């Protein structure tokens, strides 16, 4: 049993440390009232693998992964290992990145996802 406070975990490659990309993902979660715990993790360079690790380590079972090349994966711990709920990329822009974060919060709250434009 984990004693950490509940929140969506975001596992990211060290390249993104201190960047606006991390801020936008976390701000999207905050807009939904769901805490975000961002954790640097260079163990994998696959966004889905990072997202799966994040989801499995979160008491809420929801995780985001951000790899070195800018791929983003939103997933749930109960999904198959090779499946993400939503994928995106940092090149999509700040609004879309924030929406991915918001969608992670909406997953926790069992709300429909916002459309990524």
From Swiss-Prot:
Keywords: Chaperone, Magnesium, Metal-binding. One of its GO terms (molecular function) is metal ion binding. Mg(2+) binds at residue 31. Its cofactor is Mg(2+). Belongs to the DdrB/PduH family. Small subunit of the glycerol dehydratase-reactivating factor (GDR), which reactivates suicidally inhibited adenosylcobalamin-dependent glycerol dehydratase. This is Probable glycerol dehydratase-reactivating factor small subunit. It comes from Citrobacter freundii. The gene is dhaG.
């Amino acid at each position: 049993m984990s004693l950490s406070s509940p929140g969506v975990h975001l596992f990211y490659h060290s390249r993104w440390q201190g960047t606006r990309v991390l801020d936008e993902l976390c701000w999207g979660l905050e807009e939904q009232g769901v805490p975000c715990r961002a954790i640097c993790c260079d163990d994998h360079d696959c966004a889905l693998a990072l997202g799966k690790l994040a989801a499995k380590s979160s008491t809420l079972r929801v995780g985001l992964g951000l790899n070195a090349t800018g791929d983003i994966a939103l997933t749930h711990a109960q999904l198959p290992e090779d499946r993400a709920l939503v994928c995106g990329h940092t090149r999509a822009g700040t609004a879309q990145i924030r929406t991915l974060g918001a969608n992670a919060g909406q997953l926790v709250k069992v709300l429909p996802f916002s459309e990524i434009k």
